[in-house]
């Protein structure tokens, strides 16, 4: 059974297996009884729980870090790349319930699907077992990475903002100029503008990713070398 297989991997047994089923159900699967029976609502909750637990984890692991350094570390631990890495480490994609069409298009390996399902899984664990259960799960898969973070990682948006400040420019501005694709797999196009430099735009499966890509393009445009 799927429930037993995934429970062994995540080291958690669900009391309410319906929550697990909901967390693993892709929006492409239409329910006759409830069109909201998919992972989107649990994803919303799981995102908040993950951010809370990671923030507390870093606060305790690094008692002498500044707020800025803690924020940079948290960003690296909750970013899409990290979520996909963890989702792949537990083979989450094979457990996601999706339409035949979505699966045939590579849905089981789609980064956006993996991110969303992992956050939904955290939300489901939180509702089923409380904050302690959610903490145990997050600590199991995130603590090693958090503990070994030495230098605060630099993300493109932060670097671009610091560069702008060093030049006396206003902070870079980001605007969504287009959104396409279905609700369960959207594609955002974001434009970045900074002082008198020409605007550049980039696309991504979520707003944050598109902003990071746009910032990276702007850094390349101004010939900034990321250390």
Curated annotation (Swiss-Prot):
Residues 155-224 form the DRBM domain. It catalyses: Endonucleolytic cleavage to 5'-phosphomonoester. Its main location: cytoplasm. Residues 3-130 form the RNase III domain. Keywords: Cytoplasm, Endonuclease, Hydrolase, Magnesium, Metal-binding, mRNA processing, Nuclease, RNA-binding, rRNA processing, rRNA-binding, tRNA processing. InterPro entries: dsRBD_dom (IPR014720), RNase_III (IPR011907), RNase_III_dom (IPR000999), RNase_III_sf (IPR036389). The active site is at 47, 119. Pfam families: dsrm, Ribonucleas_3_3. One of its GO terms (biological process) is tRNA processing. It is an enzyme of class 3 (hydrolase). GO terms for molecular function: double-stranded RNA binding; metal ion binding; ribonuclease III activity; rRNA binding. Its EC number is 3.1.26.3. Its cofactor is Mg(2+). It is found in: Cytoplasm. One of its GO terms (cellular component) is cytoplasm. Belongs to the ribonuclease III family. Digests double-stranded RNA. Involved in the processing of primary rRNA transcript to yield the immediate precursors to the large and small rRNAs (23S and 16S). Processes some mRNAs, and tRNAs when they are encoded in the rRNA operon. Processes pre-crRNA and tracrRNA of type II CRISPR loci if present in the organism. HAMAP family: RNase_III. Homodimer. This is Ribonuclease 3. It comes from Ehrlichia ruminantium (strain Welgevonden). The lineage of its organism: Bacteria, Pseudomonadati, Pseudomonadota, Alphaproteobacteria, Rickettsiales.
């Amino acid at each position: 059974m799927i429930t037993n297989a995934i429970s062994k991997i995540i080291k958690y047994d669900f009391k309410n297996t319906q929550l697990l089923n909901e967390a693993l159900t892709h929006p492409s699967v239409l329910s006759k009884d409830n069109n909201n029976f998919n992972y989107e609502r649990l994803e919303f909750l799981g995102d908040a729980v993950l951010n809370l637990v990671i923030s507390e984890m870093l606060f305790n692991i690094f008692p002498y870090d500044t707020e800025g350094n803690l924020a940079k570390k948290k960003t690296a631990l909750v970013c899409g790349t990290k979520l996909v890495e963890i989702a792949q480490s537990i083979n989450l994609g094979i457990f996601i319930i999706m339409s035949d069409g979505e699966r045939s298009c590579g849905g089981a390996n789609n980064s956006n699907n993996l991110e969303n399902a992992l956050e939904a899984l955290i939300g489901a664990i939180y509702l089923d077992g409380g904050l302690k259960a959610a903490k145990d799960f997050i600590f199991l898969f995130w603590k090693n990475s958090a503990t070994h973070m030495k230098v605060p990682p630099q993300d493109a948006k932060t670097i671009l903002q610091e560069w702008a400040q060093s030049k006396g420019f206003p902070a870079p501005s980001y605007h969504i100029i287009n959104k396409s694709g279905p609700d369960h797999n959207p594609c955002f196009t974001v434009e970045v503008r900074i002082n008198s430099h020409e605007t550049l735009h980039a696309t991504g499966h979520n707003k944050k990713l598109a902003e990071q890509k746009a910032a990276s393009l702007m850094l390349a445009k101004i010939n900034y070398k990321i250390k």
